[in-house]
A protein has these predicted regions:
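Generic N-terminal targeting/processing segments that precede catalytic cores or assembly contacts
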Residues: 1-380
Length: 380
């Protein structure tokens, strides 16, 4: 079992939903990079449950303890170990159904792989709880990317059948303005159209009151990536971003730019025409989401991820008792989200940051962290 993502810049995660703690080790950061613990806390707060009928009643403080690799607000150049304690667990909720395989969960696949030795409490290592470690590690990289002029943000494109305005894929200036709007918003859903927030909340609460759940779509934009980042084929920009995107539990689909819409276009419609803008090469449209041949072309990278409904629902379901080897009904206990889409937005942002950070480090070494305003001018 390997719990590490990344080559040049890597994050290893550990822990289980009801264990003593979860956390990670971030390796590959240069020395002297500022680490804003207030920013990390703000990112964690966006992921944190509120117990408000829109998310799980399990509310954790999610304080991030930096155990190594950071002194006086700057990286030391050694591995950054971080830990988040689990304090609000109720493992007894799972005792009565321990032998029943929950539909949509990893109970059966974990049993098939680990032969009963896995920690099944609250989903164990497969729980969405572990995404707190992704956010904590990703937030450190996200801050470094921001100083290098690279912006990453995510909004709720669709939730419970209700849609937000899409990102302006073909207008980089309009997209930058949309990103600024999202980053200026405080608490609340990550939306471009604030008028759809209450209808979304109403739909989520309605599903929860019925013992059910809903899913949605997240849309992520990456601005400021220079041309020439990424590798053809196996380590393409799409490959590594997708790798991390699918590391977020409940993500079941991804598309870049026009994505599956390409199937209905002609080549003359799908190609992004090149043109000069001052000394820079840009494209007139951005169907390919700033990526050609697996390598960035300098235009914004935009992708969408499909998030399935939370599998933990309170309606009675059909399953099997894998110890008794017989069919059985299942009524799930415990505390669960009627929808994880709003909380998953920051998770997807931080997951993308880890992928982009690894890509940037593979291309520029640690120069982009050490000289965030100068590495592009150095012609590396």
């Amino acid at each position: 079992m390997k719990n590490t993502f990344g080559g040049a810049l890597a994050l290893t995660i550990f822990g289980e939903s009801h264990g003593r703690a979860i956390g990670g080790v971030l390796d590959g950061m240069a020395a002297g990079v500022p680490v804003d613990e207030g920013f990390i806390a703000a990112c964690m707060d966006k992921r944190r449950a509120r117990g408000d009928g829109l998310s799980t009643p399990r509310v954790e403080a999610d304080n991030v303890h930096l155990l190594s690799g950071v002194v006086n607000g700057h990286t030391t150049g050694t591995a950054i170990a971080l830990m988040i304690e689990n304090r609000n667990t109720r493992s007894g909720d799972y005792a009565k159904t321990a032998d029943l395989l929950r539909p949509g969960h990893a109970d059966y696949t974990a049993y098939a792989k680990y032969h009963g030795f896995q920690d099944a409490r609250g989903g164990g290592h497969f729980s969405g709880r572990i995404t707190a470690a992704l956010v904590a590690g990703g937030a450190i990289v996200l801050g470094a990317l921001d100083r290098a002029g690279i912006d990453i943000t995510t909004h709720i494109a669709r939730c419970a059948g209700i849609s937000d305005r899409p990102f302006a894929l073909d207008d980089a200036a309009a997209l930058a303005a949309q990103v600024s709007v999202l980053e200026s918003r405080g608490e609340g859903f990550a939306l471009l159209d604030a008028s759809v927030e209450e209808p979304m909340k109403t739909a989520i609460r309605a599903a929860g009151s019925e013992g059910d759940s809903v899913g949605g779509i997240l849309e992520t934009a990456i601005l400021g990536l220079p041309a020439g980042v990424g590798e053809p084929y196996f380590d393409s920009v799409e490959s590594l971003i997708s790798h991390m995107a699918f590391s977020v539990p409940a993500v079941k689909g991804i598309e870049f730019g026009t994505g599956f819409g390409f199937a209905d276009l002609k080549g003359s419609e799908a190609n992004d025409a090149f043109r000069m803008k001052g000394d820079s090469v840009v494209t007139a449209t951005n169907h390919n989401a700033g990526i050609n041949g697996g390598i960035t072309n300098g235009m914004p990278v935009v992708f969408r991820t499909a998030v399935k409904p939370t599998p933990s629902i309170y309606k009675e379901q059909e399953t099997v008792d894998y110890i008794a080897k017989q069919d059985a009904p299942l009524s799930i206990q415990g505390r669960h989200d009627p929808c994880i889409v709003p909380r998953a937005a920051i998770v997807q942002t931080c997951a993308a940051a880890l992928a982009v950070g690894d890509l940037m480090t593979a291309r520029y070494g640690t120069a982009w962290m050490e000289r965030p305003t100068g590495y592009r001018r150095e012609g590396l």
